[in-house]
A protein has these predicted regions:
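Short, well-ordered beta-strand segments in beta-rich or mixed alpha/beta enzyme
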Residues: 2-10, 38-71, 108
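Short, surface-exposed ligand-recognition loops at beta-strand->loop->(often short) alpha-helix junctions
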Residues: 10-22
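Non-catalytic surface loops within mature trypsin-like serine protease
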Residues: 11-13, 59, 95-98
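Intrinsically disordered, low-complexity segments enriched in polar/charged residues with Gly/Pro
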Residues: 15-17, 27-29, 41-43
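An amphipathic, aromatic/His-enriched active-site/gating alpha helix that lines ligand/cofactor pockets
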Residues: 25-37, 56-93
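Glycine-rich beta-strand-turn "strand-cap" elements at beta-sheet edges
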Residues: 38-50, 76-110
């Protein structure tokens, strides 16, 4: 079973564009690590500084190792992500069937 990490957070005022760039750099680094299957970040369409960040890992072990690599490499550059947030993030970790989950993203020819 794969592990899906879902984070919903909001940024402080006037740093939302920078925060999204930093989130995207985190997700890009995650995608390059062994054990990360998918990673993306998105900003709310209603203009609010609300963000959705999701990462799919092969296992709990990969979640821990990839998260450690990302924080060690990127936090020294810009500080911890929490320093950009207006409050604590809502974080959920879900166990999903890897094949079924990834199949949802395959386009079917009609």
């Amino acid at each position: 079973m794969a592990w899906l990490e879902t984070v919903v957070c909001s940024s402080q005022k006037k740093v939302d564009a920078r925060f999204l760039r930093i989130l995207n750099s985190h997700q890009e680094l995650k995608r390059r690590q062994e054990g990360c299957l998918l990673a993306w970040a998105a900003k709310s369409v209603d203009g609010q500084p609300l963000f959705l960040v999701q990462t799919l890992y092969k296992s709990r072990k990969h979640l821990k190792s990839v998260s450690k690599i990302v924080s060690e490499k990127l936090d020294p550059e810009h500080g911890p992500l929490e320093s950009f947030m207006s409050g604590p993030p809502l974080v959920g970790i879900f166990e999903v069937d890897e094949v079924q989950f990834l199949d949802q993203f395959k386009s079917s020819e009609k």
